[in-house]
Structures are given as C-alpha cells and as structure tokens.
Amino acid sequence: MLKALEKAGILVEALPYIKKFSGKTVVIKYGGAAMVNDQLKEAVIMDVILMKLVGIHPVVVHGGGPEINGMLDRLGLKSHFIQGLRVTDESTMEVVEMVLAGKVNKEIVALIQRFGGKAVGLCGKDGGLIQAKKRFELVKNEGGARVPTDIGFVGDVVKIEPGLVRELADRGYIPVIAPIGVGEKGESYNINADTAAGELAQALKADKLVLLTDVEGILRDRKDPSSLISSLRIDDVPALVEEGVISGGMIPKVACCVEALQGGVGQTHIIDGRLPHSLLLEVFTDKGIGTMVLK
C-alpha cells in the first residue's frame, strides 16, 4: 500500500509540469553510459515515449563515441591526434557517418518503436537540417602561439533548418538526429553532439535543453555527491569557472547551456544519465535530479 501511495504522490507531483510543458519542445542530448547499458537505454527510451504521450515534443540528438571507436578498431583504422585532438580524415569520417547515421541512429529508432512510440531517424544532411563548415582548432605551435589547425572533417554549425523536425514532431513522431552536418559542397562533418543539440534547441525555440552526462551535475566538491548545485544562473558561471568548480569536460557543456539560453531556450539541464529515469525526475518533479542552468 505504501508503494502505491508513493506512486500516486509522484503522479500528482508531475501533473502541473505535464500541464506546463504540454505542447512544448524539449531537446535531449542522449549520450554516455545511458547509450551503453541496456537497462539505462530502455529507461531513457521509455522516458522519451512518456513525454510524447503526455503532449510534450521530445527531440533526441545522440552521440556514439564508444561505437565509433569500436568500429575504427575493428577496421584497423588508427586515429591520429594533434595535442589530444582526434584528426578526422576522410576514412574516419566515413566510419563516423556510417556508425552514427546508420547503426546508432536506427537502433534508437527501433527501440522507440519497440516500446510503443513512433520515431523517425535523421542526420543533419536530411533536408539541410545541420549546415556546417570546417572547424579549425586553436593549437599551440612550437613557439607556444595558438594557431588555427585543420583537424579534418570536424565542423561548426553555420545554420539549422528546423522545419522538417518541427513537422515530424507535430505529426506525432519523435525525431532522432545524428549530429552529422553538411557543407556547401555536400561534404560531411562530424559535429559535437552537445553543440548540435544546443543549436537545434535554439532554432526550435525549445522550452528545455537536457544534456545527459556521466556525472551527477555540477558539484562544488567533485568527491562529494551531496554538494550538487541544483540550479545556477548565467551570471554565476564565470566565478564558478574561476574557482575550478566548473572545469574540464564540464566547461563546454555549461558553455553550450549558456549559448542556448542566450539564444532563447527557456531552461537548460545537465543531468546524470547513469540514473534510471533521470529524465523524468528532472522534468516532472519539484526537486529535479541534476543542475538546472537559467538565464
């Protein structure tokens, strides 16, 4: 009886959020452990389907780093690095596109269909969705100066054409997007999945951008999970970076959130994808589960 009452309480708590976000767009960056562990995969997919069933328009942008690395190893393609940055040559880009737009994307679509949802898989080339240009990374030369360096088919987003995604969502489908951009000459570019999700959220005028990660959120003390910062504002970010609270791989994720907020997205969230149903807990409960970044 106690468990039944708890479940009823959770449903009641979710009601105002369901009403608030019905008809709204939520862009979800899906990656990390939640893509590797079968139980977590199913939990994320069920969360996304439930969001759709209660009237929210979820849009999924996915990564696929481990799958790409596995396929490169299987094909015997060695990765070249410049100061820690992978150089994506033509052969590597072919594998990236094959794995992201083919294997990973269609697996997610099939899983959504299996659990009762309707999904359509896209990559950024479809309908000119993600238009991109070559990215030049600033890399230190022998003299210590940071100079623009060509790292291959890695791209920056130039423009998002969201019409196709919006139409699919309005027709009851869950769009699932592989972050492959298209250049002026039709060439493919590998786009960072966080960046692609943030840019798409802005173009769709999304109410929420949710980044699934392999950490609890932003912690004041990385060794203490209880030090989670449940919410912060853009103005708080510079000081937290200066203090080292936001550091390493969290810096580009927070920067993605800041840019999305400045581009008109309502709220952004960094949550722990290792926790089953973290997506629902963040969207539909009072306390949430990760870090919410607000304007």
Swiss-Prot record:
Annotated keywords: Amino-acid biosynthesis, Arginine biosynthesis, ATP-binding, Cytoplasm, Kinase, Nucleotide-binding, Transferase
Subcellular location: Cytoplasm
Protein name: Acetylglutamate kinase
HAMAP family: ArgB (MF_00082)
GO molecular function: acetylglutamate kinase activity; ATP binding
Taxonomic lineage: Bacteria, Bacillati, Bacillota, Clostridia, Eubacteriales
Marked site: Transition state stabilizer: 29, 253
InterPro entries in the record: AceGlu_kinase-like_sf, AcgluKinase_fam, ArgB, Asp/Glu/Uridylate_kinase, Glu/AcGlu_kinase, NAGK-C
Stored SUPFAM superfamilies: Carbamate kinase-like
Similarity comment text for this entry: Belongs to the acetylglutamate kinase family. ArgB subfamily.
TM regions (residue ranges): none
UniProt-listed Gene3D superfamilies: Acetylglutamate kinase-like
GO CC term, one of those recorded: cytoplasm
Domain of life: Bacteria
Catalytically driven reaction(s): N-acetyl-L-glutamate + ATP = N-acetyl-L-glutamyl 5-phosphate + ADP
GO biological process, one term: arginine biosynthetic process via ornithine
Residues binding substrate: 64-65, 86, 190
Known role: Catalyzes the ATP-dependent phosphorylation of N-acetyl-L-glutamate.
UniProt pathway: Amino-acid biosynthesis; L-arginine biosynthesis; N(2)-acetyl-L-ornithine from L-glutamate: step 2/4
NCBIfam families according to UniProt: argB
EC number: 2.7.2.8
